[in-house]
Amino acid sequence: PEKFKEKGHSEEERNKLEISGFIDNFSSVILGTVSSEGNPVVGYAPFFRYQGDNYIFINETEEYFSSLKNNEKVTLLFIEDESSAVMVSMRKRLTYKVEIEFVEKGEKYEEILDNFQKVDMAIQMTRNIPVFHLLKVNFLSGRYISGPRTAFDISEDRKVTEVQLGASGHPSEKQDENVTEDEERGNFTKRFKSHADSSGIVSNHFRKSKKMITESELFKLLENPAEEKEGVIYVHVPYCDKICSFCNLNRKKVDNDLEDYTNFLVSEFEKYGKTPYMKSKEIKVVFFGGGTPTILKEHQLERIFRSIHENYNLSADCEFTLETTLHNLNLNKIKILEKYGVNRLSVGIQSFAEKGRNILNRTFSKEEVTRKLKELKENFSGMVCTDIIYNYPEETVEEVIEDADIVADLKIDSTSFYSLMIHEGSKMSKDIKENTLELNYQLETDRKLHHAFLERLLATEEYEVMEHTKIVRKGRDQYNYIRFTHKGADILPIGVGAGGKIANTDIFRINNEKAFYMMSENTEEENRFKRISGLFQYPEVYFSDLKKYVSEEIFEELYKLFKNFEAKGYMKVHETHIELTTEGIFWGNNISSVVLKKCLGGNGNEKAGNIFHIDGKYGKNS
């Protein structure tokens, strides 16, 4: 905490002080244990600290009492009160595994309770009742969670260490910002499949520089016009009438509340649209993701689109995208989309192969999908784009080549292509655990399928790589949503499950009632790293662009790295830029990760605060 910084404490000492201060706020604690039958038992008990020791006062009528007598497995939970939390879903909490010791009645027992009853007068009435007992609690190991991405493990010897989080937000092995010798040489053994795997390094590095603020504090920031005039709106519609087998994201099977959700979206558009900050913005991109936005009824889509146009200034060349499935579209909806400026559709195909469509739980056969895509292109004047997933169980090279051929034959304007990622909580994850589906991931198979799909489309000479997972038809799809994202543009997130950033504040909408807001206190430095991360999502990186963000010394280190990668066949190093090969695109997120580590001080010589180049000068303040 800020109040400790002036006292000369180390970071670990400050963390200990914060944790100790957190415990001091409590007069009771939630207690969990296990019954003799192995069932979890939960209750609560009055809690008191005296002369450096911790005590609870329990009653034999509690269900957990007999378990405490026979079971050493006990955990305490201290959790912030709802009334004082910034958001109920983000309450600070501390869990401790503990050992308990019954305090025998005697002089010490009476002394402790004499002090206990000063803070809890009920002790005076119950201390002499035989069914009440005083227990000493010895803290063992614990975990303190102080924010949505900030947690600390506490060892039995009271050492406090920060929990390292992966890009997905799950605890993972510590992401060392030092570059290993194998990484330096390009000897990768595990492939990073998504941008989040590499950009997560930046998020983790800077998460300490963020603080949670309230909605009212955010809207105070929005009272001023924006400095950067270009902006993006992202709208999330978390409803589907059929859930893909690989999906564990924020989606809901459709029910009767689409009308309520429409009302919610319109109210959000109005709320943000009236702020001076958003009024000063020219919206360059509107992107509806999900879920399946086209699951909304025609009149609901009209209300939503009309509200966007009424509340925001959309540029004449605004890219307006909706994600969709084929079975959720009809001619009436297409007419409404075009009426309100929708000029890009992203269709979740995933696979044309019958086997793949069955495994991924898709609707329609290959022939039906092909026919419906042709009809869509005939009736919709904008871009028609698709998503393709490869390396699903037992997929063959012939099947992925056929996917590429159909994309080319239909003249699809762009296609995303992702290697299948199994996420906890998806149907596919459950099937694998229950042995009803076998997934034997092989890196070499992943490579073969990736190369076969990519090279087949490139061989037509009608397609080119736009970024690591996006192939576009030449002269057609610009995919400005991802370009503006990589540039660090403001993205206003609307809808449950939506995430974005405006006014240097990260926003994530949890439900219709709650969102959390994390304001960055180190904006300039963090944004520069994000720009570097964005540069390395493309097949070509020009040195002139890179030098805007790094010192000459760091650039020289990176250039040596590029030559190593060139020797591995990942790229060609030209006089003015690097150009990734097919193999380099496959390893693109790994390459981006190593570059970011180098810039974060991974060579052991420089740290993040020293690498940036501003007006020809270097310095920590820049």
Residue ranges and their predicted role:
Residues 79-83, 236-240, 417-424:
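Short glycine-enriched loops at secondary-structure junctions
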Residues 498-622:
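Charged, E/D/K/R/S-rich low-complexity terminal regions of large eukaryotic assembly subunits
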